[in-house]
Amino acid sequence: LIESASSSLKGDEQTQEMVIVSLGNNRRMAIRLSDVVRLEEVKRSDLESSGKECVVQYRNEIMPLIDIPKIFHSAEGLQKADDTLNVVVHIHEGKSLGLIVEKILDIVQGKINNKRAIEGSNIMGNIITNNSVIDTINIKRIVQNFLKFAG
């Protein structure tokens, strides 16, 4: 259960807690912990369709699922044969949205380098952790695009 995230300021760079996830094909990415409410596992047998969306019943509401590996062309995402999906739950305007990832790997502290971000991109920058450069997912942008085309 993740209820909240902490962050600290050092100079003018912000250190934040980040959830490191795998998208398959050896691609790891980071999600700001402040964008995460919960980390869940969802049974594939619980998936349903509503309009063009894949959804799951979650805490007495219908939660749409966003296939993050598919967005980044990393893996099969929803197409994988696993019985269980790893889902990062995000709240947008009071509603839960599930972000499907291949695996939830770790929670680390990192400073987002926004200089590598591309305007209008699904990547908001990157962090360095364990001697690796990891792109940070722009959750706000992904959710906006999803809601624009959902239905």
Residues covered by each model-derived region:
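Conserved secondary-structure micro-motifs at functional edges
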Residues: 1-151
